[in-house]
Amino acid sequence: MAPSQLPPMFNPTPQDIEMLLAAQCHLGSKNLQVHMEPYLWKTRPDGVNVINIGKTWEKILLAARIIAAIDNPADICVISARPYGQRAVLKFASHTGATAIAGRFTPGNFTNYITRSFKEPRLIIVTDPRTDAQAIKEASYVNIPVIALCDTDSPTDFVDVAIPTNNKGRHSIGLVWWLLAREVLRLRGTLASREAEWDVVVDLYFYRDPEAEENKEIAEEAKVPGADEIGAGAVESGFAGENWETQAPGAGVPGTAFAAASAAGATSWEADGADWAASSAAAPAESWAAEAQGAEGAKW
C-alpha cells in the first residue's frame, strides 16, 4: 500500500486493512481498463491485477464526505442489479436513510416522470457500472452525480467517483458498503467518535443464498434428538447398556397375586352359585307343580 496523503485521524486502522485483504477487495480481474490504471498496484504472474487498497480507502472517505454533505438522506439512491450487492444496498439504506433499488432497474426511473417509480435523486451509488449501466446512463441525462464500485475492467463513463475494489465477490461488495456506511455515520455524528466501534457486524451486508438458508433450516428441523439411534445402533448404544437382570420386588412372578385373587374370587362365586341353585331347586319347583295341578282340576 502506498503512503497515505490523508490526515492522521483518517488513516485506516490495521483491522480495516486486514478486513480489506481478507475480503479480497484487492483482487481485480485480468483485464485492465485504461482509466483504472492509476489504481493498479501490480500484476501477478497469473495475470490478475492487484488493486492498491490505499486508493480504495481514500475513495471510500471521499464518497462518504459527498454523501454526508447531502442534507436529506432520502435524496441518495443506492442501486444494485447484481445479486451479491442487493442485500448490501438494502442494509446501507436502512442504516443511512437512503433510497434503495435492489434488483432490476426499471428504465425511465430518472427520466420518465409519468411512471410511478419516478425519482429525482441528488446522488446515486451503484455496485457495478456494467450491470447498472442503465441507471448511470439515465443519471447522465439529468445531471445526477454517480459514485460506483469499479473493478479493473469496469467502464468509467459518466462515473464521477470510482471506488476501486473487487465488485464481483460477495464479501468484497458487502465490506465496501459496510465501510462506506460506517464512515457516513461517523461524519454525521451518529457514532460518537472514530474510536467507537460500530455495533453492526459486517456479516449483515454479505449476500446469502435464500435456497441454501431454507435447506439448512429444513435439515436442522429434520434432525430429531435420538434419531441416529434407530435400528441396530440403538441396540448397541442404548438398550445394550441397560441392566435387564435387575428386578423390582415382586417382578418376574406376575402369577402370584393374580392366583391369590382368582382363588378368592372363585370361592365367593361358587358359594353364591350354590345358594341360587338351592333356592331354584326347592321352592319354585313345588309352587309351579301345584299351580299346574290346580288349574287342570278346575278345568276338567
UniProtKB/Swiss-Prot annotation:
GO MF: structural constituent of ribosome
UniProt-recorded name of the protein: Small ribosomal subunit protein uS2
Protein family (similarity comment): Belongs to the universal ribosomal protein uS2 family.
GO annotation terms (biological process): ribosomal small subunit assembly; translation
Organism: Aspergillus terreus (strain NIH 2624 / FGSC A1156)
SUPFAM superfamilies membership: Ribosomal protein S2
InterPro entries cross-referenced by the UniProt entry: Ribosomal_uS2, Ribosomal_uS2_C, Ribosomal_uS2_CS, Ribosomal_uS2_euk, Ribosomal_uS2_euk/arc, Ribosomal_uS2_flav_dom_sf
Gene3D superfamilies: Glucose-6-phosphate isomerase like protein, domain 1
Role noted for this protein: Required for the assembly and/or stability of the 40S ribosomal subunit. Required for the processing of the 20S rRNA-precursor to mature 18S rRNA in a late step of the maturation of 40S ribosomal subunits.
Gene Ontology CC terms, in alphabetical order: cytosolic small ribosomal subunit
NCBIfam families: uS2_euk_arch (TIGR01012)
CDD domains, alphabetized: RPS2 (cd01425)
Compartmental location: Cytoplasm
UniProt-annotated stretches for the region Disordered: 269-300
Quaternary state and interactors: Component of the small ribosomal subunit. Mature ribosomes consist of a small (40S) and a large (60S) subunit. The 40S subunit contains about 33 different proteins and 1 molecule of RNA (18S). The 60S subunit contains about 49 different proteins and 3 molecules of RNA (25S, 5.8S and 5S). Interacts with rps21.
Alphabetic keyword roster: Cytoplasm, Ribonucleoprotein, Ribosomal protein
